[in-house]
Amino acid sequence: MKTLYSLRRFYHVETLFNGTLALAGRDQETTGFAWWAGNARLINLSGKLLGAHVAHAGLIVFWAGAMNLFEVAHFVPEKPMYEQGLILLPHLATLGWGVGPGGEVIDTFPYFVSGVLHVISSAVLGFGGIYHALLGPETLEESFPFFGYVWKDRNKMTTILGIHLILLGVGAFLLVFKALYFGGVYDTWAPGGGDVRKITNLTLSPSVIFGYLLKSPFGGEGWIVSVDDLEDIIGGHVWLGSICIFGGIWHILTKPFAWARRALVWSGEAYLSYSLAALSVCGFIACCFVWFNNTAYPSEFYGPTGPEASQAQAFTFLVRDQRLGANVGSAQGPTGLGKYLMRSPTGEVIFGGETMRFWDLRAPWLEPLRGPNGLDLSRLKKDIQPWQERRSAEYMTHAPLGSLNSVGGVATEINAVNYVSPRSWLSTSHFVLGFFLFVGHLWHAGRARAAAAGFEKGIDRDFEPVLSMTPLN
């Protein structure tokens, strides 16, 4: 029988006892990893690892294309996107494809094209993945030195980092070009209830763009999540794209400084842990962004935010009761505070009742009714437009409630109502994935640091208590 322990790793690995299962000739004896450790077997086989990554990209792109076509096939133009459980079409609509004034879908053909392009691309990636996994060279260092690497080669690693940064910067500029030159993007703040427009007057002032980073993350400030006009969003992408591209060039041309060589662990598993940490941060930020921000994620497509649905309810009943003769400026609620309107601690007029906690909501249907000091009583009495009433009633009944098992809506709702907002889905999924990525970061960072410190082999098995105990049988 072959030895149970690989030459490389002395801690116990639960695996097949005959040790004969070898996947594509890369077995536990030669690599130190069993088949189920996946790409860990390919740590030193750059060609095969390339195949695994290209095939993985193919799976991702195939999902995007297939899911895109599935959503197009099921799409009903008469219903809002957020009522149909769509998570991809809202992103395409936000980019200005296929929609017109008010977020109304006027053409689904661009969505079909997007799906087909992704499916075709996935076939190319799938072929490349299979080729490099099965037919291509096991290692790239000999035949294609530019694409080869050694994990310990600090200079090569920062060059690869630089290439990645440049690609990210190009991605950021693709959005900029779409907004500036290729038809524009959807702006929920456009007059009259949202429209597609080209963004002409970019915000490039560093004090504005980087001011977002210096804001507090809490209510009324909201860090970068508080961005509420497209000029700032697209201008931010100009800054971000430029920083990524220049940072990429810098990392390609330079070698790591001595402090970085000392401070960081330079191994494949360490790079994996750094990447997982970065993706985790991205996931948590995306969670907050999709939950609170109705500019980057317009409510016409994703449904209202939580605060927006709550304020919409207060507004809807203010409109109703005002029509029935209530004086909304002075009516007292059950707690002695204003029933419809009240003052915040700093003096602004805000909606009363439970929705007071969402006083800092900004939404396109509500802002026209504000004055210099919060909600304007005379505008609330004279200027409310039918479109504002319709939209707030719609948002009130589509709050982003609902659980992960798709049991939708408010707990008191009748069973026939089964509405789950895409905001709930997207923010919850990104939070959960961000958390798992963070745990993966801790796991791989711990292993990488242990390996670098030289105690990867684990506990000394000679002194385990179990060895001195009577066998179970």
UniProtKB/Swiss-Prot annotation:
It is found in: Plastid, Chloroplast thylakoid membrane. Residues 1-14 form a propeptide. [CaMn4O5] cluster binds at E367. The chain crosses the membrane at residues 69-93, 134-155, 178-200, 255-275, 291-312, 447-471. The modification N-acetylthreonine is found at T15. NCBIfam families: psbC (TIGR01153). The keyword Transmembrane helix applies. Binds multiple chlorophylls and provides some of the ligands for the Ca-4Mn-5O cluster of the oxygen-evolving complex. It may also provide a ligand for a Cl- that is required for oxygen evolution. PSII binds additional chlorophylls, carotenoids and specific lipids. Its main location: plastid. This is Photosystem II CP43 reaction center protein. One of the components of the core complex of photosystem II (PSII). It binds chlorophyll and helps catalyze the primary light-induced photochemical processes of PSII. PSII is a light-driven water:plastoquinone oxidoreductase, using light energy to abstract electrons from H(2)O, generating O(2) and a proton gradient subsequently used for ATP formation. One of its GO terms (molecular function) is metal ion binding. The modification Phosphothreonine is found at T15. One of its GO terms (cellular component) is chloroplast thylakoid membrane. Keywords: Acetylation, Chlorophyll, Chloroplast, Chromophore, Manganese, Membrane, Metal-binding, Phosphoprotein, Photosynthesis, Photosystem II, Plastid, Thylakoid, Transmembrane, Transmembrane helix. The keyword tRNA-binding does not apply. SUPFAM superfamilies: Photosystem II antenna protein-like. It is a multi-pass membrane protein. It comes from Olimarabidopsis pumila. Signal peptide: none annotated. Belongs to the PsbB/PsbC family. PsbC subfamily. Coiled coil: none annotated. InterPro entries: PS_antenna-like, PS_II_antenna-like_sf, PSII_PsbC, PSII_PsbC_sf. Pfam families: PSII (PF00421). PSII is composed of 1 copy each of membrane proteins PsbA, PsbB, PsbC, PsbD, PsbE, PsbF, PsbH, PsbI, PsbJ, PsbK, PsbL, PsbM, PsbT, PsbX, PsbY, PsbZ, Psb30/Ycf12, at least 3 peripheral proteins of the oxygen-evolving complex and a large number of cofactors. It forms dimeric complexes. The gene is psbC. GO terms for biological process: photosynthetic electron transport in photosystem II.
